[in-house]
């Protein structure tokens, strides 16, 4: 038996030896492979770091540390040459692109949320996932990078499924920028380029069709999101999947990139399809910062369920390039079973361009572009305003001769979704709007030209309200029914109105500007003293400023009222003397 055991061991020992040698060889081979992998990973990491450094040298080399930090105004002692570069960049983009390159894309922002917003907790495991859709056309690289950087650093990673970046036919496409975005933001950004510009609405639809998350968040390409912006924005959609939400839109100044607090408001449009903002209703103001109803959204920044957006048909496919899309989608939401809420606990800064900058959305001439926008207006009016479109057409008669295209698909959608009539919208969301912008306008206190008595050949003129200041110009031949630019009315709301623009004072009553009528009195309150012929701003009786002609400059200013100052004397084309006697009835004076 011992001999058998010995023979068995003699057979097994060589086998064990071979197995040991094999294990050693395998171990050494594995070590070699791991070393090669480590070298490869190190090489890849080094190459990635090198690429980032090279591209940072292109896009971030001019950054000045702490410039514009915490959203403070970015200022410096610029040379004459630099000031010329600043002016050039503002002419080309409508904002200080030169300065933007010198502000870090990762700059900090002050937390402007209401204190109660900071205490709110959200069920993160239940909140829906989000696809952020950003479209752009020839956007300044530093501005776009700041938008993306703020998203990456201030958005919970577990909620952000993707950022879909749609280049809408930029003529200044930059492959290095695309590479930098791909490397810097890794898998966060999905980049899609459309070779020929299709416009805001269609580019957004392209992005929405690529999206995979439960909720779509549409943002402009020149924004900065703030701390805690996303959770409150999407929480109402968790409660009701037919809710669309909008954040408070803070302002980023075009000239120094200062981040300024925006106010809660309710969006609307007037009877010339200008977007306007109305104050919160009393009960909404008391409930702040709770979400409140928003009749018409601004359109640039909003969140909506992906399936609900699809069910609504997205944007009307007949709308071209830009214009009226926020009216169309807002009306469709409210009238077809949804709602829009503004969420004060969510704040996003928006870079607003210089008011004098004329944005071009196409390569077409200016008149062709205006026709496209007018066509959009008419399509929205024909589908959604019902009989109230006549009020719009009375103020915008040129719309009636604009070809509107085929409306069958939109009418079918309206019927299929059992959408309510526009009257429901007015009755339920617009009671204060109708007081400010009635279907039938009440009698005016005075109207026609506003003629300078000291320079009787000159009248107040608003030829180009986008420039922000009125001027003096030769009077129209008809003083009662002059040209639209010289037709002013002292309205039932004590405004000095021309069309949908009002005269207002700024800088403690010194400067006179033209701005969209806001219906809140204040700096747009005016009265007329028929005895002294003075046009007086404000409701204060003890410290009054009057409109004053500056004929040598073809301008107007405001200064302390002086009955002996002939430059402060004016004459309306028509004066309703009997109605003017009751001007101060029911007006609170200070």
From Swiss-Prot:
Family per similarity comment: Belongs to the glycosyltransferase 2 family. GalNAc-T subfamily.
Keywords (A to Z) from UniProt: Disulfide bond, Glycoprotein, Glycosyltransferase, Golgi apparatus, Lectin, Manganese, Membrane, Metal-binding, Signal-anchor, Transferase, Transmembrane, Transmembrane helix
Residue positions the entry lists as glycosylated: 77, 241
Record-annotated disulphide pairs: 117-345, 336-419, 459-475, 502-517, 546-561
Cell compartment(s), UniProt: Golgi apparatus membrane
Source species: Drosophila melanogaster (Fruit fly)
Ranges where the Ricin B-type lectin domain occurs: 446-573
Region (Catalytic subdomain B), start-end ranges: 291-353
Listed pathway(s): Protein modification; protein glycosylation
Topological category with respect to the lipid bilayer: Single-pass type II membrane protein
Binding site for substrate: 168, 221, 322, 353
The protein, known as: Polypeptide N-acetylgalactosaminyltransferase 8
Record region (Catalytic subdomain A): 127-236
Main location: Golgi
């Amino acid at each position: 038996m011992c001999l058998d055991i010995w023979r068995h061991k003699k057979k097994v020992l060589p086998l064990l030896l071979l197995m040991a040698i094999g294990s050693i060889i395998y171990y050494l081979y594995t070590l070699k492979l791991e070393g090669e992998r480590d070298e490869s990973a190190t090489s890849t990491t080094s190459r990635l770091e090198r690429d980032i450094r090279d591209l940072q040298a292109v896009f971030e080399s001019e950054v000045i540390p702490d410039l514009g930090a915490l959203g403070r105004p970015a200022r410096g002692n610029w040379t004459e040459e630099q000031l010329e570069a600043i002016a050039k960049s503002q002419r080309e983009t409508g904002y200080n692109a030169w300065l933007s390159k010198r502000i870090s894309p990762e700059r900090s922002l002050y937390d402007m949320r209401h204190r109660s917003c900071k205490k709110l907790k959200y069920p993160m495991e239940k909140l829906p996932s989000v696809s952020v859709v950003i479209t752009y056309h020839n956007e300044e690289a530093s501005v776009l990078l700041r938008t993306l950087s703020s998203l990456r650093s201030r958005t919970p990673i577990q909620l952000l499924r993707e950022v879909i970046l749609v280049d809408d036919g930029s003529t200044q496409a930059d492959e290095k920028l695309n590479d930098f975005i791909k490397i810097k933001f890794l898998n966060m950004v999905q980049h899609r380029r459309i070779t020929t510009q299709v416009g805001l609405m269609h580019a957004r639809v392209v992005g929405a069709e690529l999206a995979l998350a439960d909720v779509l968040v549409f943002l402009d390409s020149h924004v900065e999101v703030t701390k805690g912006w996303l959770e409150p924005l999407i929480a109402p959609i968790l409660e009701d999947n037919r809710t669309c939400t909008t954040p408070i839109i803070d302002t980023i100044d075009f000239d120094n990139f200062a981040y300024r607090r925006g106010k809660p408001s309710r969006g609307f449009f007037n009877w010339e399809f200008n977007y306007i903002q109305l104050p919160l209703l009393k009960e909404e103001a008391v409930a702040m910062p709770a979400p409140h109803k928003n009749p018409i959204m601004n359109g640039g920044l909003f969140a909506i369920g992906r399936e609900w957006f699809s069910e609504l048909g997205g944007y009307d496919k007949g709308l071209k390039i830009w214009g009226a899309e926020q009216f169309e989608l807002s009306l469709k939401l409210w009238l077809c079973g949804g709602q829009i809420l503004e969420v004060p606990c969510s704040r996003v800064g928006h870079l607003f361009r210089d008011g004098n900058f004329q944005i071009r959305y196409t390569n077409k001439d200016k008149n062709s572009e205006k026709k496209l926008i007018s066509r959009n207006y008419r399509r929205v009016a024909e589908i959604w305003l019902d009989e109230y479109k006549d009020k719009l057409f009375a103020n915008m008669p040129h719309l009636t001769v604009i070809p509107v295209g085929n409306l069958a698909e939109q009418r079918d959608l309206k019927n299929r979704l059992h959408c309510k009539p526009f009257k429901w919208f007015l009755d339920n969301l617009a009671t204060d709007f109708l007081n400010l912008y009635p279907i039938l306008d009440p009698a005016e206190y005075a109207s026609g030209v506003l003629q300078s008595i000291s320079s009787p050949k000159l009248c107040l003129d608003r030829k180009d309200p986008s420039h922000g200041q009125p001027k003096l110009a030769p009077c129209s031949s008809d003083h009662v029914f002059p040209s639209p630019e010289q037709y002013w009315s002292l309205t039932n709301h004590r405004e000095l109105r021309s069309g949908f623009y009002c005269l207002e004072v700024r800088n403690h009553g010194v400067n006179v500007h033209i701005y969209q009528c806001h219906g809140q009195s204040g700096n747009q309150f005016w009265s007329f003293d028929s005895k002294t012929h003075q046009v007086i701003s404000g409701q204060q009786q003890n410290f009054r400023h009057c409109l004053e002609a500056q004929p040598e400059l073809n301008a107007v200013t405001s200064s302390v009222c002086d009955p002996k100052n002939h430059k402060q004397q004016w004459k309306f084309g028509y004066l309703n003397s009997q109605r003017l006697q009751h001007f101060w009835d029911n007006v609170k004076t200070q």
